[in-house]
Amino acid sequence: MNHILFLLTAAFCFPSITVAKIIEAGSPDKKNVITIETDNQVSYSLSRNGTKILDTCPLSLTVGNDTWGTDKCRKITRKSVSEKVEFIVPRKYKETVDNYNQVELIYKDYKIEFRIYNDGVAYRFVSTANNKQPVKKESVSFRFGQDHTSYTLLTDQLQNWFEQDYTVKPINALPKDSFSVAPVMVEVDKYKVLLAEANLYNYPGMYLQPALESFHGIFANYPDKEVPYEGDNKIYVSTRKDYLIPTCGKRVFPWRVTGIFDNASSILQSELIYLLSEEKEQAADYTWVKPGKVLWDWWNDRNIYHINFKSGINTDTYLYLVDYAAKHHIEYVLIDEGWSARNDLLTLNPDVDIPRICEYATKKGVGIQLWSKWVNIMRQMDEAFAQFSKWGVKGVKIDFMDRNDAKMVNFYEQVAIKATQYKLLVDFHGSYPNEGMRRKYPNLMTREGVIGLEYNKWSKRATVTHDVIIPYLRMWVGPMDYTPGAMLNAHPETFYENQHEPMSQGTRSHQLAMYVVYESPLQMISDSPTKYDKNLRSFEFIKSIPTTWDETVPLEGEVGEYIALARRHNDTWYIGVINGATPRHIEIDLSFIGNGPKKIKAHIDGVNAGQQAKDSQIIEQVIKDNEKLPIDMSRGGGYTGIIHIEK
């Protein structure tokens, strides 16, 4: 990150005898206003354009026998920051501006920082003394003062896959013995309010438990006893300590974040979680990080045919995939489960010659990525990553963590550090959603934490409605490995689960639009080469879509209904529209691209796509300056347009 502009106002420091009990601060655009009260217990409330967003929300942190946030504030400082940020791995933008106002409450051994952005507010505790006591409890509340519709991912287990269905209900109608994976969305009048966390290190991740007109933070205590299960494939925490982390130390704690947006589309512009997160070390070199598309073997069950060898988990299959990737300019091939012994990454499956595959792939200009369950990485990280590097492996996909207590959060960072040392890209699956660690470690390319395409192999949960909720909620916090690319497409009445030859819900154009709409610097190409060879028109579109973006322009949409946006990579614009369950006609204003006619090549729903989901067309359109782009979509449909700007 380059710091181009930094503006720091003079800090206003007040002696403890004159410290105000009520402090008010606004966002740079003055639309968001936070009111902080310091009497007895610190609390805050929040409004936007005069509309109450959050009612009085108390906060505290229990360290040893002390409860921070309940003693006397000694001093208050304020500052304003406007700072240009350049992304090492661009997700939405090549660059943006980190612009906020900050209020800092200073106490004897700690501080509480509040930051007010144009798209939200956040606060965190900062320990300023090397406190050796355990952190026992944190009190986090988001109180709305009224009942509102919420979008939650409910569970009753601290150990889970972070892959729940969205529950859309008023807060007061939610079961109070459950809690939600973050982010949670609450609709307050016309505003979309998102609750999450940022900069999570050496601390448990936050769940959100519904209460009367509010949500409260829930955290997993530190593990005590851990036992293997599912044939040593996973580790279950059977008992936990009576604290969150064993030692407080001198440190910053995670940000508690409230994003506030005027409409659904404005969520798509926000990089708030990233901006609140710790930067990479100045000297750290990540020029080797290479985003791209990944040919993946597992989803399609290596179902390749019209070939002269037996496909499966074997060397011939992976050499074939390398050849296919090289032919079609796909950057990576992911070798999923089965290439090594079940519990030993250094003992190869005799049918899979990893050194030979890697050597061959290197000559072809293709990178190899390897899958592993996390328990093997935990046990063999040093030896395995060193060996991967010697083989020429370019990335790892690590799976089945299924928890977010502090010990597991530390594992994520240990992976990031060691993977950086050996120049390995990382894709976390069975993972909690993003919380900003990718800013400090840009080789953390993507992660799951979402119901994605894999669910179509065994369930009907990856619906077209789900597909137009997740870009507004899950994707707000960071890259999302949904793994699109299905060539067998069906509507609900003809869809069925199939492990060997899976399909997707929604139309072919619905699938293709995911490559523009869903953000993931490593983007999977999930179906088999045989399927792509039979559907070359669609495959050519997939191949032509980049995985990182210089600019993003939200166009229109509603949560659970549809999403339309434009993205630019170099001088080419891409239009992506994903539709939900209802047929839809929209008209898009393209004036943001500039003057002159726009020549568009588009992948659209065919005229019979409402009946046959595979029906699609490739068309060419020319849109003049005084015209809008008309888009007609089937139920579960989509649209992808590519606009080359002629200079």
Give, region by region, the residue ranges found by the protein language model.
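An acidic-aromatic substrate-binding cleft motif
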Residues: 248-324, 328
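Catalytic cores of secreted or luminal carbohydrate-active enzymes
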Residues: 509-555
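Bacterial Sec-dependent N-terminal signal peptides
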Residues: 1-22
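N-terminal accessory beta-strand-rich subdomains and adjacent acidic, glycine-rich linkers
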Residues: 22-277
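Carbohydrate-binding surface patches
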Residues: 559-595, 639-640
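C-terminal beta-strand-rich structural cap/linker in extracellular carbohydrate-active enzymes
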Residues: 620-647
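Edge strands and adjacent loops of beta-rich recognition modules
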Residues: 91-97, 541-565
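Aromatic- and carboxylate-enriched substrate-binding clefts and catalytic-loop regions
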Residues: 335-507
